[in-house]
């Protein structure tokens, strides 16, 4: 889309939805239905003619896709492959758009059949892969073609352009990308965004590659204005910087993604960087999920204005997590995603498992950047952390472990923490136990922490921990795997399956 910022700032909601309707129609008819083994079978099995899906409202007729439909397992390790667009000559002739057929015919006429096949190979042959982190299922590969990489570069360039302006980036400044170097999208989104916008960035690879001390050396060298990392590692870096008396006075903003960033967490990391000399630092969170294949973020300087998504690439809806009924955009509900463009691995009506607080989806102009796009409320919890717990032998209790991320960080005496779920005596027929591992801020705070956590958990969650174990920080950092894993191991379920 040319002049995308001008268009997305000036258009009406009706203009935006009209574009999405057209993109959806074209994508389903010319790409998804003919070339996706999974969705062709899904529509055929449910008696849904693809040419009857004309608007985003019509999507409600299509059954949902969830992680269990995609994730490989021992019985079907290749399950994810059925979500890849796989064209063949016959289906291209039958389903491709007139513009595509004309382009292919022209290439064949002017340059020969080899050139035409290379065009198709460029568009459909996978060349890049990232993985889900496997927190709720086995790690799932999502494949990108060169066409997909162009879409990702487009999205990254847009987000980079907005961020670069909002932080007033100047030549000579440097950002530090401390996302882990891995087949995971966070690192690559930052790499693409900064490279395309000409932003000098140390692509450190995180603690596992460059190492925490060297990253801190780079940040404290004097010209680092931005620090980007997953939440747990960002907190670890800043805590370490404070312990070592590092000068971080040049840092002007923090960006985090890959995990939720609750308000208390935001204030904690901002306070840490202020204590290292930063003046009026800003915090911004990025959201998204692997299945989206690119990652939205907030505007810098706004007060949690929501994750920005571009309507020409994605469509979102909210549903009731129990009934599956579509909800109004301003409600609270489970976020459900449909791709409007792409090749490689594609999902339609994908249930993310993320519960978005009201107003879930906001299409009013962003108060910071002015874009009228889909902004997802950044207050999100995970359905996967609603656990069935057998705290007595009589019945199961649904425990919302998302509340731990609200309860524990509000206790000022707590420096670091982890929760382990296990069975009493490791007996699968025994009661469940909730074990908390805590590092106090200072010695002598153990009893205060024990009483406060017990009281807060009883009030907020109607449960109390089975046991609270106090450990030194270095031991808990090892437990959390802060420097060796993509995401910290905050809640560990060690109960037998």
Task: Tell me what each language-model feature is.
Residues 2-6, 66-284, 292-302, 306, ...:
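Active-site phosphate/ATP/adenylate-binding loop shared across adenylate-forming ligases
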Residues 1-29, 33, 37-38, 174, ...:
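Active-site glycine/GP-rich loop and adjacent strand/helix microenvironment
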Residues 1-131, 137-158, 221, 432-435, ...:
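Nucleotide 5′-phosphate-binding alpha/beta core
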């Amino acid at each position: 889309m040319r002049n995308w910022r001008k268009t997305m700032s000036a258009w009406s909601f009706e203009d935006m939805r009209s574009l999405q309707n057209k993109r959806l129609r074209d994508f389903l008819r010319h790409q998804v239905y003919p070339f996706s083994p999974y969705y062709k079978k899904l529509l055929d099995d449910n008696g849904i003619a693809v040419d009857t899906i004309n608007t985003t409202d019509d999507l409600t007729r299509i059954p949902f896709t969830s992680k269990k439909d995609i994730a490989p397992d021992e019985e079907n390790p290749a399950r994810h492959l059925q979500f890849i667009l796989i064209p063949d000559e016959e289906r291209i002739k039958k389903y491709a758009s007139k513009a595509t057929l004309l382009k292919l015919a022209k290439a064949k006429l002017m340059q020969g059949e080899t050139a035409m096949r290379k065009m198709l190979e460029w568009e459909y042959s996978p060349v890049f892969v990232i993985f889900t982190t496997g927190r709720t299922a086995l790690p799932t590969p999502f494949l990108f073609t060169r066409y997909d990489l162009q879409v990702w570069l487009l999205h990254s360039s847009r987000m980079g352009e907005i961020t670069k302006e909002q932080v007033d980036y100047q030549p000579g400044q440097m950002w530090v990308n401390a996302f882990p170097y891995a087949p995971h999208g966070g690192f690559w989104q930052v790499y693409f965004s900064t490279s395309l916008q000409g932003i000098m960035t140390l692509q450190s690879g995180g603690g596992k590659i460059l190492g925490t001390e060297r990253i801190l050396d780079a940040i404290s060298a004097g010209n680092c204005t931005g620090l980007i990392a997953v939440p747990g590692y960002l907190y670890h870096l800043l805590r370490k910087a404070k312990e070592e008396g590092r000068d971080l006075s040049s840092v002007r903003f923090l960006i985090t993604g890959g995990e939720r960033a609750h308000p208390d967490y935001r204030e904690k990391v901002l306070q840490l960087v202020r204590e290292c000399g930063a003046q009026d630092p800003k915090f911004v969170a990025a959201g998204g999920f692997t299945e989206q294949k690119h990652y939205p973020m907030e505007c810098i300087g706004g007060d949690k204005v929501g994750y920005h998504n571009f309507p020409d690439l994605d469509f979102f809806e909210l549903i009731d997590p129990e009934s599956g009924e579509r909800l109004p955009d301003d409600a609270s509900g489970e976020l459900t995603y449909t791709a409007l463009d792409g090749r490689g691995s594609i999902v339609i009506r994908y249930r993310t498992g993320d519960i978005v607080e009201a107003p879930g989806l906001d299409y009013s102009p962003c108060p910071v950047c002015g874009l009228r796009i889909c902004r997802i409320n950044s207050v999100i919890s995970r359905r996967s952390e609603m656990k069935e717990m057998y705290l007595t032998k009589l019945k199961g209790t649904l425990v919302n472990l998302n509340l731990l991320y609200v309860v524990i960080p509000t206790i000022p005496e707590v420096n670091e923490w982890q929760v382990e779920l296990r069975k009493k005596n490791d007996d699968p027929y025994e009661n469940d136990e909730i074990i908390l591992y805590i590092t106090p801020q200072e010695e002598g705070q153990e009893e205060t922490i024990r009483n406060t956590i017990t009281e807060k958990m009883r009030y907020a969650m109607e449960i109390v921990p089975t046991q609270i174990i106090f450990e030194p920080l270095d031991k808990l950092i090892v437990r959390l795997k802060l420097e060796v894993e993509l995401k910290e191991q905050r809640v560990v379920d060690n109960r037998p399956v």
